[in-house]
Design a protein with these regions (language model features):
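Acidic, gly/ser/pro-rich intrinsically disordered tails
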Residues: 1-2, 120-136
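OB-fold ssDNA-binding interfaces and closely related basic DNA-contact patches used
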Residues: 1-62
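Beta-strand elements of well-folded, non-transmembrane domains
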Residues: 29-31, 96-98, 118
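A short secondary-structure junction signal
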Residues: 37-40, 102-107, 125-127
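Beta-strand/loop nucleic-acid-binding surfaces
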Residues: 54-79
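Exposed beta-sheet edge/beta-hairpin loop segments within beta-rich domains
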Residues: 71-90, 97-108
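OB-fold/S1-family single-stranded nucleic acid-binding modules
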Residues: 101-122
């Protein structure tokens, strides 16, 4: 399945390792799409930018399995290696799955591929903006 939206906090080529390592993207979608995901049992994260679906892929699977990174494609479906900045428009390919763990159950979204529709370059907070601008 494929959904289009606006990317925030995307970790596609390198996993986010703040907690358990995983590839992830917060995808801000329109209200109708958010309601559809919620009706299918998926959580919706309310962000300042709008409702978001969190789509992720854990790096480590059962029995020592290591999952590969999702594909990252440009508009022409060529593989690319870029960092996706917040506000980029993307199309995300995912699959839905059910999970059970320690007596709990739910639904998840496996991040399979991301196609960049309109890239906003990723910028680090390295302080260069201060050097380029006006004096203090």
């Amino acid at each position: 399945m494929i959904v289009e939206g606006t990317a925030y906090w995307a970790s596609i080529k390198e996993p986010n390792t703040t907690y358990e390592p995983m590839y992830t993207i917060n995808l801000v979608v329109d209200e109708e799409t958010a309601k559809d995901f919620a009706a299918r049992g998926h959580g919706i994260r309310e962000m300042e930018e709008g409702p978001a679906v969190v789509i992720k892929r854990k790096v480590n699977g059962p029995n020592g399995m290591v999952r590969k990174a999702p594909r990252l494609l440009d508009q022409n479906k060529n593989d690319v290696d870029v960092l996706i900045g917040n506000g980029s428009t993307v199309r995300v390919q995912y699959s839905e799955y059910d999970w059970e763990w320690k007596g709990k159950a739910g639904k998840g979204l496996d991040l399979q591929a991301v196609q960049i529709v309109n890239l906003v370059p990723y910028k680090t907070g390295d302080g260069d903006e201060l050097l380029d601008g006006e004096e203090f």
